[in-house]
Amino acid sequence: MAANNNSDPILDEGGGGGVKHEAVGEAGEGKGGGGGAAATQAPAAMLPRSGSRPQLDLSGAAIHGNLEDRNPTILLPNQSDDISHLALDIGGSLIKLVYFSRHAEHSSEDKRKLSTKRRLGMLNGGRRSYPVLGGRLHFVKFETGKLNECLDFISSKQLHRGGVDSPSWRSGAQPDNIVIKATGGGAFKYADLFKERLGVSLEKEDEMDCLVAGANFLLKSIRHEAFTHMDGQKEYVQIDQNDLFPFLLVNVGSGVSIIKVDGHGKFQRVSGTNVGGGTYWGLGRLMTKCKSFDELLELSQRGDNSTIDMLVGDIYGGLDYSKIGLSASTIASSFGKTISDDKELSDYRPEDISLSLLRMISYNIGQISYLNALRYGLKRIFFGGFFIRGHAYTMDTISFAVNFWSKGEAKAMFLRHEGFLGALGAFMSYEKHGLDDLRIHHLVERFPMGAPYVGGKIHGPPLGDLNEKISWMEKFVQKGTQITAPVPVGFPVTTGMGGFERPTAKGDILRSDASAALNVGVLHLVPTLDVFPLLEDPKMYEPNTIDLDLNEYKYWFKILSDHLPDLVDKAVASEGGTDDAKRRGDAFAHAFSAHLARLMEEPAAYGKFGLANLLELREECLREFQFVDAYVSIKQRENEASLAVLPDLLMELDSMNEEARLLALIEGVLAANIFDWGSRACVDLYHKGTIIEIYRMSRKKMQRPWRIDDFDMFKKRMLADKKGQPYKRALLFVDNSGADVVLGMIPLARELLRNGTEVVLVANSLPALNDVTANELPGIVAEAAKHCGILRKAAEAGGLIFDAMAGIQDDLKDEPVSVPLMVVENGCGSPCIDFRQVSSELAAAAKDADLLILEGMGRSLHTNLNARFKCDTLKLAMVKNQRLAEKLFNGNIYDCICKFEPVP
């Protein structure tokens, strides 16, 4: 048995973990239990959600502190101070915790941001007040047998008192009568112990109520939550929120409960069966002498059920029964072959018995579930419960049964967070955090490293601060042990990491469950994120241009791995090259390599992952190890070099007529986009010349027609009405620092301003590679404005410059008062952009925009090449990757894209 015998709780900085299970527990406590009796009963009455839950008292509510704080605290003077941030699901084998932590960072608004918000109409009564604090939802599991460790964890973080960052904890107040929501049989069994150790009372929540509430929340709020599992392949399913209900929720515990869910808080238990996980474990224990559920599943990984089950081929001489559509490998009778065999129980391999038993029970659960779905006209069936636990073969078997009996009309679906349904439902029963008001775009899931995960086992205690995390990683590296993945979710210790072949009647091969298990991250609640309002069809929008199949994964993993040493060097240098920085740099390299190894092992581990997600994962990993901006010194140097030659460029542009100038500007944007530290080919160029030499070389190579060349169409639109303004407001999504923004996008912005178009420069909220950020742009614009009256007046009008720059001479000082030039952040810290989650400032700026310009590979090629918007859109990029050029355009590296998409 390859289970993890470590008794420590596992957490992913509050994220999911895996532990060894010695008891089933949950099922016998109501969730999925008692199935047999219910199977013959009439459907239960509709169960309403409890009305006794405490409500949020909003009387006298006011924003506390800075009125313009990014994530404002709402002061509730009449609210009692017993707000809890913790809920539990206490089963027989596992305790599941869901807890909330506030964001530590609270950014203050400077004068520029306030000016921009005021101009965008975000301060004049249009401001939303958020009933939920910006923060994180964490998911943690403990063995129920190690309950004291769970209590120690709660106490150390003061979760029962709102956490160590809560006002009540900081004030030293000792609130009386603290109540924590809990579900599961252990909520009754261990109530006295919680009172004794923590001084809290457990308020018991109905288990089925919590299951349904948890499932509804996940399906509503997590984009890649539900997935199908057929032939060992996971496929995430995007569910239309308007078409979610009704569905069937099948909870497989010791027995099986089948629940028809009609809406939020509206459900009924319509059926069940007494043949469930307890049946599998009980019969399996009798026949194989296995001591635990996980050991029994371990055996099934190496089983061959054809030695025990009677197959259709056994009856028909190895042939299919094609007349009724049965293949030779179909099971005709579970355990049927043992009838004619002159063998005793001891003559059969325990592995084969376990697999045959697993198939028998899983097939029947799938069939009964589909028959209930058919009865109520439902096509969507979600399965959960301890019996599922991310076990690849169990999911495959249930999926096969549903597909077979429905003739392909229905699909079995599973949930990535399925082990936390009850705890989530209990957490939501507080109705104090506004979770019911959250939408899918408010939640961002991230995957920090937890404990080192090696050889299918999690080693070591929960990782606390960063130093402890690094120390643990160094320990494994010193031993020469490869850290192969961050902490996975659910039940990764069911088997080892050997990738056992699993012979079946069909000869199928599935991975061991340690590699097939999915991961649960930390859910970041960001109520200031919005859907970009100019998306033509938000429901159909897919940011990633290329799906990452196995070959694509291998290619990009090699690219990222090869780039890693250089990135570490720059990250360490950005922190002064100190010993501490070197230590963190090494830890980052090991952590990100572990992420790559995990995704190579199971591409679906973190949900549906495209290249944009992969690139953002790298940036998040850098931030996890406290590297704020790895390219900061490089960006500063390139900005200074580019600003030095900007006056000459502007003078050259001003000597041209309007048509020639527009072409030169677009050529300049494309040429300057060559400066990308994320491209290996471009990095090699940096070693062969200065930034200006490379820029001039790139300009000389600008020969039309480009690979995609819609310039003439764009020119016609720009010059169509010389007397009026062709566009009211343009949003320019900028890319790299240095020449890219200074010699490319700023001159283009200047031309739009000259024509009377408001310009909003949109940049990253957080650093990513050498991309310019929204915090850096005002300083760059201010320097550029010293040499240009158009830029200076527009920057003053847009609040980017507040002090008059008297004494600065230029040839354009008599230009008329300009329309504003503004800067907003996009809400992300990635080289790409997902328009399903952008900052509220960007969403507000988009209201009056009628032109979008997406610049750079990340924002217009890797993502959004095929995206359609409600206004005219220009996509500009130089292709700096040969494989991408071939795959997208049958082109070559350094090809240019000028794609104009006007609205009808």
Curated annotation (Swiss-Prot):
Residues 473-904 are annotated as: 4'-phosphopantetheine phosphatase. It catalyses: (R)-pantothenate + ATP = (R)-4'-phosphopantothenate + ADP + H(+); (R)-4'-phosphopantothenate + H2O = (R)-pantothenate + phosphate; (R)-4'-phosphopantetheine + H2O = (R)-pantetheine + phosphate; (R)-4'-phosphopantetheine sulfonate + H2O = (R)-pantetheine sulfonate + phosphate. In the N-terminal section; belongs to the type II pantothenate kinase family. In the C-terminal section; belongs to the damage-control phosphatase family. Phosphopantetheine phosphatase II subfamily. Mn(2+) binds at residues 735-736, 771. The lineage of its organism: Eukaryota, Viridiplantae, Streptophyta, Embryophyta, Tracheophyta. GO terms for biological process: coenzyme A biosynthetic process. A motif (Subfamily II EGMGR motif) lies at residues 855-859. Keywords: ATP-binding, Coenzyme A biosynthesis, Hydrolase, Kinase, Manganese, Metal-binding, Nickel, Nucleotide-binding, Transferase. Transmembrane segments: none annotated. Pathway: Cofactor biosynthesis; coenzyme A biosynthesis; CoA from (R)-pantothenate: step 1/5. InterPro entries: ARMT-1-like_metal-bd_sf, ARMT1-like_metal-bd, At2g17340_3_helix_bundle, ATPase_NBD, PanK_long, Type_II_PanK. Pfam families: ARMT1-like_dom, Fumble. One of its GO terms (molecular function) is ATP binding. This is Pantothenate kinase 2. Subfamily II proteins have an EGMGR motif about 50 residues from the C-terminus. This motif lies near the metal-binding residues in the putative substrate-binding cleft 2. Subfamily II proteins occur only in eukaryotes, in two forms: as a stand-alone unit in plants, and as a C-terminal domain of pantothenate kinases in plants, animals, and chytrid fungi. Residues 1-56 are annotated as: Disordered. GO terms for cellular component: cytosol; nucleus. Its cofactor is Mn(2+); Ni(2+). It comes from the Eukaryota. Gene3D superfamilies: 3.30.420.40, 3.30.420.510, AF1104-like, Uncharacterised protein PF01937, DUF89, domain 3. Catalyzes the phosphorylation of pantothenate the first step in CoA biosynthesis. May play a role in the physiological regulation of the intracellular CoA concentration. Functionally redudant with PANK1. The phosphatase activity shows preference for normal or oxidatively damaged intermediates of 4'-phosphopantetheine, which provides strong indirect evidence that the phosphatase activity pre-empts damage in the CoA pathway. Hydrolyzing excess 4'-phosphopantetheine could constitute a directed overflow mechanism to prevent its oxidation to the S-sulfonate, sulfonate, or other forms. Coiled coil: none annotated. It comes from Oryza sativa subsp. japonica. Residues 1-472 are annotated as: Pantothenate kinase. Its EC number is 2.7.1.33, 3.1.3.-.
